[in-house]
Amino acid sequence: MDSDFHVKPEIRILGIDDSALLNEKVMIVGTVFRGGDWIDGVLRSEITRDGLDATEVMVTMIKNSRHHNQLRVIMLDGITYGGFNVVDIEELYRETGLPVIVIMRSCPDFEKIRSALKHFSDGEERWKIIKKAGKIEKLITGRNGTPIYIQKAGIGAKNVEKIIRLTSIRSSIPEPLRVAHLIATGITLGESRGKA
């Protein structure tokens, strides 16, 4: 069921991105934002490269955070972290009680993903989680007319659009994700690079 709520200008949002894949353990960084204007906190944890622990690690990171009770939404940069460590967005929503918005710069190539998953003994399980994330929708935020692609759990389309427009103040990517990416790559590589 999609929750419908009033989107306040200073809604607390947690944006999560991963770092570069340098080791078996991959750092994930969460930034807590008030709307798209300012950062209130930073969370970090580690997931297994190509593992299946991303959902569980994110749930624990969020529930153990002092920010947990103030958070209203989780934003993810896609649903695969640390290689092919797939996040079950329905479970993330259910376990945290927080709606989940997935943001992607481009629409995934499911044929390539399906082909890559053949190299995993549990590829079918990962594929089911990917398909379970639901329909991918195209959204234009107003920033240069550049589209982004979204998936969602526990939140309606109108609120997703409001939140993305509120937080996409410097690019088509919402600030919580853009800044999480900068922090994660900066810590891992010594300098931030690439795009969220």
Curated annotation (Swiss-Prot):
Please state which protein family the record places this protein in. Belongs to the UPF0215 family.
Looking up Gene3D superfamilies in the UniProt record yields: archaeoglobus fulgidus dsm 4304 superfamily
HAMAP family of this UniProt entry? UPF0215
Q: What is the lineage of its organism?
A: Archaea, Methanobacteriati, Methanobacteriota, Stenosarchaea group, Methanomicrobia
Tree of life domain: Archaea
Protein known as: UPF0215 protein MM_1007
Identify one Pfam family in the record. DUF99
